[in-house]
Amino acid sequence: MSDLLVFPGGGRLPVKDDRDLGHLLPRSAAGDLPDKAYQHWRAPPALDQGKSSTCVGHGCHQLLRASPVRNVKNIPDPYQIYNEAQKIDEWPGENYDGTSVRAGVKYLAKQGYISSYKWAFDGPTAVNHILTVSPVVIGVDWREGQMSVDGKGFIYPKGRMIGGHCVLVVGANTQEKCPDGNIGSVTLLNSWGPKWGNKGRAKLSMKAFDELIRANGEAAAVFETLKPQEAPVVS
């Protein structure tokens, strides 16, 4: 099992800074979601971060390779993204494990892969972006109930707090009935290898997704660009 990202300074996720490229997305109420009920973006096979704390690097790397804008040639590997993110994140030095989603997407923007990024502070706002624009990179609390996937393909933010973790949210289905009775789910692409969950993926109810983001989570809604050296890949 891969190590979780443990954030410096007590394990809390950093406050979003909307002074650079990042700004707040307009909030979307659950009733304001688009008529489109389902979207699942194509993504590469799940990576495995091993025993490292490089989930931000892996999540951001998988974002680059996922549709709708798929940068697949000469892109920075997960460890390069992680190392560069540590240099520009909220904490001094680099002698610690982990970094922030903010630093990861900020590095991708500096490299020209992202034209802008905005922050979603709740589940419906993030889901709206997933349904209409692209996957979302999140950094959220991770509990015992999220360590393994049940028979229905779901994880649950219950039990003892383990730490913080970054994953890529590649899909949303506003009409799926979840095992806990809630309606609506999102699909996460983890970086614990293809043997975890459903080929490295798991589902989370939209209710739980909303609670995780509101609990001081990071949800980066990005607007990607295709690097000049890239040949477009049909999604």
Language model regions located:
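Catalytic-core signature of thiol
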Residues: M1-S235
